[in-house]
From Swiss-Prot:
InterPro entries xrefs: Aminoacid_DH-like_N_sf, NAD(P)-bd_dom_sf, THF_DH/CycHdrlase, THF_DH/CycHdrlase_cat_dom, THF_DH/CycHdrlase_CS, THF_DH/CycHdrlase_NAD-bd_dom
GO molecular function: methenyltetrahydrofolate cyclohydrolase activity; methylenetetrahydrofolate dehydrogenase (NADP+) activity
Pathway per the UniProt entry: One-carbon metabolism; tetrahydrofolate interconversion
The protein's name in its UniProt record: Bifunctional protein FolD 2
PANTHER family, sorted: C-1-TETRAHYDROFOLATE SYNTHASE, CYTOPLASMIC, C-1-TETRAHYDROFOLATE SYNTHASE, CYTOPLASMIC-RELATED
Complexes and interactors: Homodimer.
GO cellular component terms listed in the entry, alphabetical order: cytosol
One family name in Pfam for this protein: THF_DHG_CYH
Function: Catalyzes the oxidation of 5,10-methylenetetrahydrofolate to 5,10-methenyltetrahydrofolate and then the hydrolysis of 5,10-methenyltetrahydrofolate to 10-formyltetrahydrofolate.
UniProt-listed GO biological process terms: L-histidine biosynthetic process; methionine biosynthetic process; purine nucleotide biosynthetic process; tetrahydrofolate interconversion
Residues binding NADP(+): 166-168, 232
Gene of this entry: folD2
Length: 287
């Protein structure tokens, strides 16, 4: 048995093309293109790559991208002042602060400073709260991107047992909400979970977001499972691998590759969120 590979690059391209068409339609109607502000603090190589990829995707889809690349010595006060200005800037629909931030800047304070209507990462407590009560607006990019991947391949989660390994605010927790919203029975595993293998082996759908290379052995995977590997880990030889042993393809029915699986969908969903925020702002201005 060999698993079908869920091609995130192909699906992300369809999403970006759809956003591009809607942006072109806006322009033909005399409306402006959505605007995204991207803020990078410090010179972390991985963060720089992520930011550049996001800017390229914006250009491809016709969005206006504005960047602020500040040194790591930038203060929390300075960043909060910039966010305040961007919150009031009517040409900016989305504000993205690339994480992680330097230790002297509190990420939660920064996230909460972004207006919920411009929180295109979907991290603000307001937007997480709306997802919790089944009234989502701007949804966390990676979890929602994962759901769109499954939907594209007509993989229903309704009634399935979904296991998430990793309970971060960015992926694990909102992923559990997305799966619950779609009708799955969800289990969230974390560092205090006893007997992780037992939980993983019962998963019809396994989502991993741990950040440890090959953390989940292939023989833990339930035959016929759907494996969504969010982890992106660099090995000593420079290659990238996920949280799940690649040999899981011999057991699972569907797997997302690393790279080329979830990553492209995160960026595509960011563009979708920015367009949605722009449309929300337009409706607000009209009303």
């Amino acid at each position: 048995m060999s698993a079908q590979v869920i091609n995130g690059k192909v699906v992300a391209k369809t999403v970006i093309d759809r956003v591009k068409q809607r942006v072109q339609l806006r322009k033909s109607q005399g409306l402006r293109a959505p605007g995204l502000a991207v803020i990078l603090i410090g010179d972390d190589p991985a963060s720089s790559v992520y930011v550049n990829n996001k800017k390229k995707a914006c250009e491809e889809a016709g969005l206006v991208s504005k960047s602020w690349n500040w040194p790591s010595k930038a203060t929390q006060y300075e960043l909060l002042e910039l966010i305040k200005q961007l919150n009031e800037d009517t040409s900016i629909d989305g504000i993205l602060v690339q994480l992680p931030l330097p230790d002297h800047i509190d990420a939660e304070t920064i996230i909460e400073a972004i207006h919920p209507d411009k929180d295109v990462d979907g991290f603000h407590p307001y937007n997480i709260g709306r997802l919790t009560v089944r009234m989502p607006t701007l949804r966390p990019c990676t979890p929602y991107g994962c759901m769109n991947l499954l939907n594209h391949y007509d993989l229903s989660v309704k009634g399935k047992h979904a296991v998430i390994v990793g309970a971060s605010n960015i992926v694990g927790r909102p992923m559990s909400l997305e799966l619950l919203l779609a009708g799955a029975t969800t289990t969230v595993c974390h560092r205090f979970t006893a007997d992780l293998q037992t939980h993983v082996s019962m998963a019809d759908i396994l989502v991993t977001a741990v950040g440890k290379p090959n953390f989940i052995p292939a023989d833990w995977i339930k035959p016929g499972a759907i494996v969504v590997d969010v982890g992106i880990n660099r090995l000593p030889d420079g290659s990238l691998t996920g949280d799940v042993d690649p040999r899981a393809r011999e057991v699972a029915a569907y797997v997302t590759p690393v790279p080329g699986g979830v990553g492209p969908m995160t960026i595509a969903t960011l563009l979708e969120n920015t367009l949605k925020a722009c449309e929300i702002h337009q409706l607000g201005a009209v009303s």
